[in-house]
């Protein structure tokens, strides 16, 4: 029997659900629909709650530029869908002492974005694979003794490792 491994997603992968454009990722639309609908065999999918806050901050930034209240309303429209995905578990690193401690160490090691530190710390605390496109954060994780062994995958790694047969 295959071990079930936690897969912790960075904010990038939920932004399209809020109508926020992201960098071009191979077959993102096709495979993200499968991920949200069916999950991923052999994995428990986690979304740190700080990703939701980060999405709201990004919408706020768009709102400031456009002064269009519909931009902010996209959060209220998208959040029920995200919460209804049975394939995704929300993890709150702010309520997990180990995740907080690790996030502080990542911040101290030089990563400027505390939200990113909390998201990465979630992957370490859950002993899972961290799915991210953040190269700078990945580099910092590899130099910290307690985070250097965390598995880090990009979207292309996920496609190559888990969706190759599709």
Task: Specify the residue positions occupied by each region the protein language model found.
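Short, well-structured N-terminal submotif of metal-dependent ribonuclease cores
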Residues: 1-47, 61-75
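Short His-Asn-centered micro-motif
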Residues: 9, 49, 132-134
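Residues that scaffold the ATP/ADP-binding catalytic core of kinase and kinase-like folds
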Residues: 16-18, 58, 140, 162
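Acidic, PIN/NYN-like endoribonuclease modules and their adjacent C-terminal/linker elements
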Residues: 1-4, 92, 120, 125-166
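Alpha-helix capping/helix-boundary segments
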Residues: 13-14, 51-52, 118-119, 136-137
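Active-site neighborhoods of divalent-metal-dependent phosphate/nucleic-acid chemistry enzymes
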Residues: 87-133
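Acidic, glycine-rich loop-and-strand cores that form catalytic or ligand-binding grooves
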Residues: 78-81
């Amino acid at each position: 029997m295959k071990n079930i491994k936690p897969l912790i997603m960075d904010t990038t992968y939920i932004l399209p659900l809020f109508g926020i454009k992201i960098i071009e990722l191979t077959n993102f639309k096709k495979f993200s629909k499968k991920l949200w609908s069916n999950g991923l065999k052999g994995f428990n999918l986690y979304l740190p709650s700080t990703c939701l806050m980060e999405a709201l901050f990004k919408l706020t930034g768009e709102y400031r530029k456009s002064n269009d209240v519909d931009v902010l309303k996209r959060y209220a429209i998208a959040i029920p869908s995200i919460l209804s995905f049975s394939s995704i578990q929300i993890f709150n690193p702010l309520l997990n002492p180990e995740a907080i401690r690790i996030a502080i160490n990542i911040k101290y090691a030089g990563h400027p974005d505390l939200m990113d530190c909390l998201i990465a710390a979630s992957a370490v605390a859950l002993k899972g694979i961290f799915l991210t496109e953040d190269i700078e954060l990945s580099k910092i994780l590899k130099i910290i003794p307690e985070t250097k062994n965390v598995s880090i995958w990009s979207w292309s790694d996920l496609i190559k490792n888990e969706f190759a047969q599709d």
